[in-house]
Amino acid sequence: MKRTYQPKNRRHKRVHGFLKRMSTKTGRNVLKRRRLKGRKRLTA
């Protein structure tokens, strides 16, 4: 049986990347919260 998680860098960036976060209002809220929390890495 094949495992369910088959990581792909391109999809990872496209779905969870910085540009994707910036493209929606809620995504910008995510970045804002992560900045306030002091995350070293904001996105994938």
From Swiss-Prot:
Provenance organism: Desulforamulus reducens (strain ATCC BAA-1160 / DSM 100696 / MI-1)
Protein name: Large ribosomal subunit protein bL34
Key word DNA repair present: no
Keyword entries, A-Z: Ribonucleoprotein, Ribosomal protein
Annotated family: Belongs to the bacterial ribosomal protein bL34 family.
Presence of the UniProt keyword Transport in the record: no
GO term, biological process aspect, one: translation
Signal peptide positions (record): none
Molecular function in Gene Ontology: structural constituent of ribosome
Alphabetical list of PROSITE patterns matching this protein: RIBOSOMAL_L34
GO cellular component terms attached to this protein's record: ribonucleoprotein complex; ribosome
